[in-house]
């Protein structure tokens, strides 16, 4: 299983801070649900989340500021 590069992940998320938040939220979703069952046993949820972000499977939208 090839690990995605940090540069590639940063381009997808916009910044390393946004990447950390996005990966953490997705990893929590995987932990709390049964989605992780489709991945190889022993693969950590954060690794799965980063692979999904690199593959473009995760779509996100930042909230808009209210005037």
Curated annotation (Swiss-Prot):
Record's catalysed reaction(s): RNA(n) + a ribonucleoside 5'-triphosphate = RNA(n+1) + diphosphate
Family matches, as SUPFAM superfamilies: RPB6/omega subunit-like (SSF63562)
Enzyme class name: transferase
One Pfam family this sequence matches: RNA_pol_Rpb6
EC number: 2.7.7.6
Keyword Phosphoprotein: no
SMART domains listed in its UniProt record: RNA_pol_Rpb6
Keywords: DNA-directed RNA polymerase, Nucleotidyltransferase, Transcription, Transferase
GO BP annotation list: DNA-templated transcription
MF-aspect GO terms: DNA binding; DNA-directed RNA polymerase activity
Record bears the keyword Nucleotidyltransferase: yes
A GO cellular component annotation in the UniProt record: DNA-directed RNA polymerase complex
Superkingdom of origin organism: Bacteria
Record function comment: Promotes RNA polymerase assembly. Latches the N- and C-terminal regions of the beta' subunit thereby facilitating its interaction with the beta and alpha subunits.
Family: Belongs to the RNA polymerase subunit omega family.
HAMAP family xrefs: RNApol_bact_RpoZ
PANTHER family reported for this sequence: DNA-DIRECTED RNA POLYMERASE SUBUNIT OMEGA
Quaternary structure annotation from Swiss-Prot or TrEMBL: The RNAP catalytic core consists of 2 alpha, 1 beta, 1 beta' and 1 omega subunit. When a sigma factor is associated with the core the holoenzyme is formed, which can initiate transcription.
Protein name listed in UniProt: DNA-directed RNA polymerase subunit omega
Organism per entry: Moorella thermoacetica (strain ATCC 39073 / JCM 9320)
């Amino acid at each position: 299983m090839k690990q995605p590069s940090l540069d590639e992940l940063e381009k997808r998320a916009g910044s390393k801070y946004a990447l950390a938040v996005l990966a953490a939220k997705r990893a929590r979703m995987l932990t709390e649900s049964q989605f992780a069952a489709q991945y190889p046993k022993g693969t950590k949820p954060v690794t799965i989340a980063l692979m999904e972000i690199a593959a473009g499977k995760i779509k996100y939208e930042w909230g808009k500021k209210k005037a």
